[in-house]
From Swiss-Prot:
GO molecular function: RNA binding; structural constituent of ribosome
Record localization: Cytoplasm
Stored Gene3D superfamilies: 3.100.10.10
Keywords: Cytoplasm, Ribonucleoprotein, Ribosomal protein
Stated family: Belongs to the eukaryotic ribosomal protein eL18 family.
One GO term (biological process): translation
Domain of life, per lineage: Eukaryota
Gene this chain is encoded by: RpL18
Keyword Cytoplasm: yes
Provenance organism: Plutella xylostella (Diamondback moth)
Gene Ontology CC terms: cytosolic large ribosomal subunit
Name the UniProt record assigns to this protein: Large ribosomal subunit protein eL18
Length: 183
């Protein structure tokens, strides 16, 4: 008598194509799918995989974090590649000169990078400048920075759990029954 084999772990769960209907994103996917196939560079495969990702998995990156990553001495003259959005950070006083390639850059962040003498590339411009990803550095935003992530983990109240509970309101108000006014 044979055994019933459990096949629930057989498939690899990841996106194999972009879910968005955005034509510009789909054109980038076409371009990087071609580059990933024709060049033997790991960089293009990583960019392609990140282009497939959902918005949650392409978190925004602040200018201050980007500047902190790019001011390392080994990263001088490299192109920062962000498959996502670069946002402004008012806490950063002086923006260093840097070359950035990103899917989207907010208006204020764009102005500050360009004022510092920096350069902002689109991904199709990046493909022409660095088709194999030479002299580039891939940078991501924090995926666990979302407020929703605080609610994940062992149940709130469990030992050593720092999970935030889902609470409608704090205080004695929630214990009150809804009163009907006599009309």
């Amino acid at each position: 008598m044979g055994i019933d084999i459990n096949h629930k772990h057989d498939r690899k769960v990841r996106r194999t194509e972009v879910k968005s209907q955005d034509v510009y994103l789909r054109l980038l996917v076409k371009l990087y799918r071609y580059l990933a196939r024709r060049t033997n560079a790991k960089f293009n495969q990583i960019v392609l995989r990140r282009l497939f990702m959902s918005r949650i998995n392409r978190p925004p990156l602040s200018l201050s974090r980007l500047a902190r990553h790019m001011k390392k001495p080994t990263r001088e003259g490299l192109i920062a590649v962000v498959v996502g959005t670069i946002t402004n950070d008012t806490r950063l006083y002086k923006v260093p000169k840097m070359t950035v390639a990103a899917l989207h850059v907010t208006e204020k962040a764009r102005a500050r990078i360009l004022d510092a003498g920096g350069e902002i590339l689109t991904f199709d411009q990046l493909a022409l400048r660095a088709p194999t990803g030479r002299k580039t550095v891939l940078i991501q935003g924090q995926r666990n920075a979302r407020e929703a992530v605080r609610h994940f983990g062992p149940a709130p109240g469990a030992p050593r759990s720092h999970t935030k509970p889902y609470v409608r309101s704090k205080g004695h108000e929630q214990a009150k029954p809804s009163r009907r006014s006599n009309v």
